[in-house]
């Protein structure tokens, strides 16, 4: 891509010649604290058959949060991942194609928790002045997602493509990420 990425500041080392990151966040299950007083603090608690928790998740074939959940579970439970999925299965109300549909169903009260990001409550606080939505913090930690952009082969010779890639790392672009995409910027903004 030949884009200067020296100002990128991520929780991981980034060395990629094709993809340029533009934001990042950690996956989490979001809940309504007025309805769910004791949220799960681990996948073990989430999948425990002694609770009646209900979940909405996204399809890993069509949604990056869905794929992120698959990888998150695999990173923690490795060869025992199937056991967690078996325990989670009866709790899953639906598997949506994407994040928007899943989050909308959650807001309508269709489930106790929805797969989203640790930053999702910030939207409700800042845009709606609503503090009841929280991220369930898991003892195992949370899986990182870095959203990226790339120049296609067709756009490789297009100056506008390269200019846009530079723009996504600019202060003007990065400074609006926290309150428009509700994720963390990849550069240090003021």
Spell out what each predicted region is.
Residues 8-17, 124-137:
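Ligand-binding "clamshell"
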Residues 152-190:
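Mature extracytoplasmic/periplasmic domains
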Residues 25, 85-89, 95-96, 128-153, ...:
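Periplasmic-binding protein-like
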Residues 107, 111-132:
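A ligand-binding cleft/hinge motif common to bilobed small-molecule-binding domains
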């Amino acid at each position: 891509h030949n884009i200067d990425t020296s100002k990128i500041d991520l929780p991981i080392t980034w060395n990629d010649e094709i993809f340029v990151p533009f934001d990042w966040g950690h996956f989490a299950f979001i809940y309504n604290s007025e309805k769910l007083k004791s949220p799960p603090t681990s996948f073990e608690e989430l999948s425990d058959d002694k609770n009646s928790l209900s979940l909405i998740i996204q399809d890993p074939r069509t949604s990056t949060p869905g794929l992120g959940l698959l990888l998150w579970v695999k990173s923690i439970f490795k060869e025992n991942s199937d056991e967690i999925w078996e325990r989670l299965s009866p709790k899953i109300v639906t598997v949506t194609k994407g994040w928007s549909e899943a989050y909308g169903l959650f807001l309508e009260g269709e489930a106790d928790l929805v797969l989203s990001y640790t930053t999702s409550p910030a939207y409700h606080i800042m845009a709606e002045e609503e503090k009841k939505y929280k991220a369930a913090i898991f003892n195992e930690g949370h899986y990182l997602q870095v959203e990226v952009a790339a120049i296609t082969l067709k756009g490789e010779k297009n100056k506008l493509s390269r200019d846009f890639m530079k723009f996504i790392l600019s202060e003007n672009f990065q400074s609006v990420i926290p309150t428009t995409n509700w994720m963390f910027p990849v550069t240090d903004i003021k």
